[in-house]
Amino acid sequence: SGPALGSALVELYSKATKRKQEIREFCQRTVWYPADTPCTSQDSTTSEAPLPLFSLYLYRMGRRAADTPSRAAQESHVVAMRSAFAQQGMSCHVQHAHDSLIFRTSKGIPGSSVHSAIELFPDESMKLTVPGVMLDPHMQEEALRQISALDIEVPANALFIGATETLRRVTRMASLLDRYVRLRTISWTNYAVAYELENMAGVMLWSETETYARYISNHGMLFCGTTDCRSRIRYLDDGIHGSFRARQFAGSHFFEACGLPLGSPSEEDNELVDALLRGEKTNMGQ
């Protein structure tokens, strides 16, 4: 009847709206990094620049958070994630949190060197956070010298991330998620995905390649030209993302956000992308 159908449609709409809200609330970083704690030092001149972060959020649909799996089931999740790390020859350290498990390639010690982290939830939703690879002081000085030699002016306190090194870190960590779902025989079509950029605004890509030097001489520096933001949510069961891979998605969206011209028809753009993927060294400054 009409009223019954109308009531059913209202209920379906309400459920869909609630699920979208759950996904939006999920898509925010919850793994702690030292910069999340306000600095209490009065000397602001000694504070370090905020660490650029890229986070990938994968929300598993069709399961309710209230449906907590058994301990045996959760242990099988840990075994699978450890196996994913082992398959890539990476060490795996597990930290328990209040409603998730955090997997790192090194021991998580507050205030120590910052590393990537995967947060795994009981329903097998996942969050990946990858810090950009910042240049050390020597490399920063060398980058500024080489850029100046190209008659490009950048401020002395400009923030750089190593293009090839960061790409390798992002794709290597995202590959762990691909391995995990294969080991668990889960389809990516069960997930909704979004990504987030933090402390990335104005951060420049740097590479010691001849191709990069030529490119920035013609087009200027590549850098993140937007403020920190979170992407739209993509539903991987939409028929478009049947070949989705976390590795490819994370790598391409991170570097496109940094100004890298991915998918461009230009030969010059494609030559640059290939050079950064290879990480071929330059002879500049030698």
What would you call each of these model-derived segments?
Residues S1-Q286:
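Bergerat-fold GHKL/Histidine-kinase-like ATPase
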